[in-house]
From Swiss-Prot:
Signal peptide region: none
Function (record text): Nucleotide-binding protein.
HAMAP family referenced in this protein's UniProt entry, alphabetically: YajQ
GO MF annotation, one: nucleotide binding
Recorded superkingdom: Bacteria
NCBIfam families membership: PRK05412.1
The protein's name: Nucleotide-binding protein BTH_I0730
Alphabetized InterPro entries for the sequence: DUF520, UPF0234-like_C, UPF0234_N, YajQ-like_sf
CDD domains (UniProt xref): YajQ_like
Species annotation: Burkholderia thailandensis (strain ATCC 700388 / DSM 13276 / CCUG 48851 / CIP 106301 / E264)
One Gene Ontology CC term in the entry: cytosol
Length: 161
């Protein structure tokens, strides 16, 4: 019975590359000369540092541009509050979301069941497994989910026949 998993996970290698490219661009840009603006990555957490709120916005724009160029959806980032740190500097922490949350998993299962397509959807940890008799049904479910779920980036993997 063909099946696939619906997951929501960023490619961490591409995120790391985007962070390195952002730091390289920030170090060479004229408007950041003499400032301590940078992006640091620790596991699934990005920390943006800058001299003031305006420069922090510029750092965020550079990071978003680099992530977009590397095909990493920026909806994976969940920004925290802007914090003041010593010496008139600011920082902001952005966590990278992983997995399909419980609410989103229930929404995906409900969309699949309401579609009347002959497939079954079940929640398995931080993924949703969709299985059906025909591969065409699974492809129509993928198209349906891409159209219906727009607030969170979804990936479809682990295809089995």
């Amino acid at each position: 019975m063909p099946s696939f998993d619906v997951v929501s996970e960023a490619n961490m290698i591409e995120v790391k590359n985007a962070v390195e490219q952002s730091n390289k661009e920030i170090s060479t840009r004229f408007d950041f000369k003499g400032s301590d603006a940078r992006v640091e990555q620790k596991e699934r957490e990005l920390t943006l540092y800058a001299d003031d709120d305006f420069k922090l916005g510029q750092v965020k724009d550079v990071l978003i541009g680099k992530l977009a160029k590397r095909n990493v959806d920026v909806r994976f980032l969940d920004y925290g509050k802007i914090e003041k740190i010593g010496g008139d500097k600011v920082k902001q922490v952005a966590t990278i979301k992983k997995g399909v949350s419980g609410d989103l998993a229930k929404k995906v299962v409900r969309i699949v069941k309401d579609s009347k397509i002959k497939v079954q959807a079940s929640i398995q940890g931080d993924a949703v497994r969709v299985s059906g008799a025909k591969r065409d049904d699974l492809q129509s479910v993928i198209a349906l989910l891409r159209k219906e779920v727009t607030d969170t980036p979804l990936d479809f993997n682990n295809f089995r026949d």
